[in-house]
Swiss-Prot record:
The gene is BETV6. Keywords: Allergen, NADP, Oxidoreductase. SUPFAM superfamilies: NAD(P)-binding Rossmann-fold domains (SSF51735). Its EC number is 1.23.1.-. This is Phenylcoumaran benzylic ether reductase Betv6. GO terms for biological process: lignan biosynthetic process. InterPro entries: NAD(P)-bd_dom_sf, NmrA-like, NmrA-type/Isoflavone_red_sf, PCBER-like. The keyword Methyltransferase does not apply. The active site is at 133 (proton acceptor).
Length: 308
């Protein structure tokens, strides 16, 4: 059996982090999670930490802002996967510095898991978040650290349960608001699958110093196509309200945080088409479902079925 790298996840109790921790543990990689003392005693995150222990995950106490704790943790593993949240993206320079000092890390996955930030046409406030991720890429490359960037596009759990309708808790059954003309195609991936594909990439030479795009054929839909699929499932035609780009841009400017960030990402994806408006070239990227055709991913159609 091939050697399986030891993997450390930073931000493992966060939204996408927990899926990556679980995928790593279940795939037989020796799995480590960096946790702060405060996380263990947190009522919600503490439960997750207990779940990790049950999966055989080793907890390493440390903190993004404690350089020595990072170096000590990194010396025990081969691969570092960062899944830190929005507010800590810029602070990943601290991870890079500790990787340089530790000197043994075979691969670094910075916190990405969305659009390919080198190929976006975003407005503020999403523009700055994307630019911060791009800066972390450049810093990683400049330091000569081996890397993989996972561009997993949309989390299914963010979009599909409500079809991006604000204030709803299930998909709409009367009317639906559609951004732009509804024709730009986007990609929707279930979080478990993002975890699975990410871990598969860890020891794969084909993904070294590349962007891994998670774009399975059955998960690429325009907004109009998703609405049509949902209408077919519920046997009903919805009233469609199209929001022109100018109106969406105005809404972004007038909305509070985090609504403005979400709307700006929706603008990038559904108006500018930033998930699908470029070709993946072998010089910079590979596509996960082509690399790992044996992974049985959840399709958009299967995902929506639970809400019918």
């Amino acid at each position: 059996m091939a050697h399986k790298s030891k993997i450390l996840i930073i931000g493992g109790t966060g939204y996408i982090g927990k899926f990556i921790v679980e995928a790593s543990a279940k795939s037989g990689h020796p799995t480590f999670a960096l946790v702060r003392e405060s996380t263990v005693s947190d009522p919600v995150k503490g439960k997750l930490v207990e779940k990790f222990k049950g999966l055989g995950v080793t907890l390493l106490h440390g903190d993004l802002y404690d350089h020595e704790s990072l170096v000590k943790a990194f010396k025990q593993v081969d691969v570092v996967i960062s899944t830190v949240g929005h507010l800590q993206l810029a602070d990943q320079v601290k991870i890079i510095a500790a990787i340089k000092e530790a000197g043994n890390i075979k691969r670094f996955f910075p916190s990405e898991f969305g659009n390919d930030v080198d190929r976006v046409h975003a407005v503020e406030p999403a523009k700055t978040a994307f630019a911060t991720k791009a800066e972390i890429r450049r810093k990683t490359e400049a330091e000569g650290i081996p890397y993989t960037y996972v561009s997993s596009n949309f989390f299914a759990g963010y979009f599909l349960p409500t079809l991006a309708q604000p204030g709803l808790t299930s998909p709409p059954r009367e009317k639906v608001v559609i951004f732009g003309d509804g024709n730009a195609r986007a990609v929707f991936n279930k979080e478990d699958d993002i975890g699975t594909y990410t871990i598969r990439a860890v020891d794969d030479p084909r993904t070294l110093n590349k962007i891994v795009y998670i774009k399975p054929a059955k998960n690429i839909y325009s907004f109009n196509e998703i609405v049509a699929l949902w209408e077919k499932k519920i046997g009903k035609t919805l009233e469609k309200i199209y929001v022109p780009e100018e109106k969406l841009l105005k809404d972004i400017q007038e909305s509070p945080i985090p609504i403005n960030v979400i709307l700006a990402i929706n603008h990038s994806v559904f108006v500018k088409g930033d998930h699908t408006n470029f070709e993946i070239e072998a010089s910079f990227g590979v596509e996960a479902s082509e690399l790992y055709p044996d992974v049985k991913y959840t399709t958009v159609e299967e995902y929506l079925q639970q809400f019918v």
